[in-house]
Amino acid sequence: MAELDIQISVDDIGWPGEETLLSFCERVLGAAVIYLRDSEKQPFPTMPPEVSLVFTDDASIQDINAEWRGKDKATNVLSFPAFPVRPGKMPGPMLGDIIIARETVERETIELEKSFDDHLTHLLVHGFLHLLGYDHMNSDEAEIMEGLETRILAQLGLSDPYEGQDLKMEP
């Protein structure tokens, strides 16, 4: 049984095809659901909840970031929960939207010396946790969220993306 009902939109020709991205996202987000559910960190509905993923470019995500967050710049990932939810509480049937910008991800992979797939995996997990109410606005929240990211990524065979870094809090 699928862990999530994943809907994908590809708005930039630089991304792989929809089938490739869907398979990738099912593996990554499926692992996140299994870890969160089995570790009793997060309950999930019996029916697979829906998440919408948009794979776009820097110009599009910059427009969205300016409109919804008042930040007129491109960013790697934006998450828009469909409904307010607190971490560890049952989400609704529609989790929300995750939007990822290809050019920013590509630049960051060079800066971080990571593979594109590994960095994209991290951003998908990060965005997914935001849909479940997790955040990093203060050090306590950041510690919880980054700890979950690290453990989920470990389930996928990836190393700690925060190793040797300070907690990443929003300004």
From Swiss-Prot:
Keyword terms, alphabetized: Cytoplasm, Endonuclease, Hydrolase, Metal-binding, Nuclease, Ribosome biogenesis, rRNA processing, Zinc
GO molecular function: metalloendopeptidase activity; RNA endonuclease activity; zinc ion binding
Note accompanying the cofactor annotation: Binds 1 zinc ion.
UniProt key word Metal-binding: yes
Enzyme class: hydrolase
Top-rank taxon, per record: Bacteria
Chief place where the protein resides: cytoplasm
Binding-site residues for Zn(2+), renumbered to this chain: 126, 130, 136
Alphabetized HAMAP family for the sequence: Endoribonucl_YbeY
Family, per entry: Belongs to the endoribonuclease YbeY family.
Function text: Single strand-specific metallo-endoribonuclease involved in late-stage 70S ribosome quality control and in maturation of the 3' terminus of the 16S rRNA.
Protein name, as recorded: Endoribonuclease YbeY
